[in-house]
């Protein structure tokens, strides 16, 4: 395993009034150790996924341990053969995961953490309302048995869905989950603020569950979407068979790639009839540069991802 790239998903909700001052030393630590990926800093904490050698990730964790506030940062590891990120970034944000509701602060109030080994028993309770807090394209390729899919396009839509579909007086027990634990932790803080009394969330998220719960005992079905070039991981955390459309961000299956509407890097069956021409042209140009760099055995070209045109 020593020659594998270590992919570390990490976050912690913690008060960081000096978060702006942390950016440069954190970025320098990443660069000094050849670590790729993106970390977000905000007054409410830190969040992100990075990758590098075993020694590099250990050096980053050692850097966090120098600050008592970050010493016990939650992190989950998986492995891959190739670097899943192209860039190294540390960004300053208002929120480390954007819910968009003022006053929601997991540093002040949060639901009950549930360890992966206790999760199956909880969600088997018929009185428990099980909610997947991820986006629709993530849920489409894998989720837990019996989970409700809010069909959200972004986490910002989650509060509206809750208000429209759930009632604290009727739904006494709520359990939520997400990829690495951060969205469901923040969602639990929001739900408590809305008057829901028993709110639970999966500690470490789906990734920790897949790491710790034996496959023969799993209640997980499908693959888990991840926010890097692996696109998805299986129950053993190995890379899945999905690719990702660079135009709409949807995961695309082997069957999708056989479609007449699939054009590598440009469009897929999910978006071919809805993409603005500006986005399509940007995607074509980006794909051309990628193929040219590949033919010359050069690094992936650094440029704006056309997906971001729809993410303003």
Curated annotation (Swiss-Prot):
Name the CDD domains for this protein: RHOD_YceA
> Where along the chain is composition biased (Basic and acidic residues)?
279-294, 302-312
- Residues in the signal sequence: none
Tell me which Gene Ontology terms the entry assigns under biological process.
tRNA modification
Q: Name one GO molecular function term.
A: oxidoreductase activity, acting on paired donors, with incorporation or reduction of molecular oxygen
Q: What residue stretches are annotated with the Rhodanese domain?
A: 124-218
Keywords, comma-separated and alphabetical:
Oxidoreductase, tRNA processing
- A family per Pfam: Rhodanese
Work out whether the entry's keyword set contains rRNA processing: no
Q: What sections of the sequence does the record tag as coiled-coil? A: none
Q: Where is the active site?
A: 178
Region span, Disordered? 279-312
Superkingdom of this protein's organism: Bacteria
EC no.? 1.14.-.-
Q: Which reaction does it catalyse?
A: uridine(34) in tRNA + AH2 + O2 = 5-hydroxyuridine(34) in tRNA + A + H2O
Cross-referenced InterPro entries: Rhodanese-like_dom, Rhodanese-like_dom_sf, TrhO, TRHO_N
- Identify the PANTHER family for this entry: RHODANESE-LIKE DOMAIN-CONTAINING PROTEIN 7-RELATED, THIOSULFATE SULFURTRANSFERASE/RHODANESE-LIKE DOMAIN-CONTAINING PROTEIN 2
User: What HAMAP family does this protein's entry cite?
Assistant: TrhO (MF_00469)
Q: What is the similarity comment for this entry?
A: Belongs to the TrhO family.
Protein's name according to its UniProt entry:
tRNA uridine(34) hydroxylase
Record the organism. Answer: Ectopseudomonas mendocina (strain ymp) (Pseudomonas mendocina)
Q: What is this organism's lineage?
A: Bacteria, Pseudomonadati, Pseudomonadota, Gammaproteobacteria, Pseudomonadales
């Amino acid at each position: 395993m020593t020659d594998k790239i270590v992919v570390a998903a990490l976050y912690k909700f913690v008060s960081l009034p000096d978060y702006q001052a942390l950016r440069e030393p954190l970025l320098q630590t990443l660069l000094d150790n050849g670590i790729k990926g993106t970390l977000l800093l905000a007054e409410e904490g830190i969040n992100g996924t990075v990758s590098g050698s075993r020694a590099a990730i250990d050096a980053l964790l050692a850097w966090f341990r120098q600050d008592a506030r970050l010493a016990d940062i939650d992190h989950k590891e998986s492995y891959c053969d190739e670097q899943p990120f192209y860039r190294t970034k540390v960004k300053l944000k208002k929120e480390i995961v954007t819910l968009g509701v003022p006053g929601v602060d997991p540093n002040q109030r949060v639901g009950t953490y549930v360890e992966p080994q206790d999760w199956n028993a909880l969600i088997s309770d018929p009185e428990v309302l099980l909610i997947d807090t991820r986006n629709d394209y993530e849920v489409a390729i894998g989720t837990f048995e019996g989970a409700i899919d809010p069909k959200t396009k972004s986490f910002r839509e989650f509060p509206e869905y809750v208000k429209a579909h759930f009632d604290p007086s009727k739904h006494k027990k709520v359990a939520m989950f997400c990829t690495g634990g951060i969205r469901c932790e923040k969602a639990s803080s929001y739900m408590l603020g809305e008057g829901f009394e028993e709110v639970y969330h999966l500690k470490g998220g789906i990734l920790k569950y897949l790491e710790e719960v034996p496959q023969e005992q799993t209640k997980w079905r499908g693959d888990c979407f991840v926010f890097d070039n692996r696109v998805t991981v299986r129950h053993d955390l190995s890379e899945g068979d999905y690719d990702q459309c660079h135009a709409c961000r949807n995961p695309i299956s082997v069957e999708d790639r056989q479609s007449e509407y699939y054009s590598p890097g440009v469009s897929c069956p999910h978006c071919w009839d809805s993409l603005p021409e500006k986005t399509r042209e940007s995607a074509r140009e980006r794909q051309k540069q990628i193929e040219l760099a590949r033919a010359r055995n050069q690094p992936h070209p650094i440029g704006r991802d056309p997906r971001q045109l729809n993410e303003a």
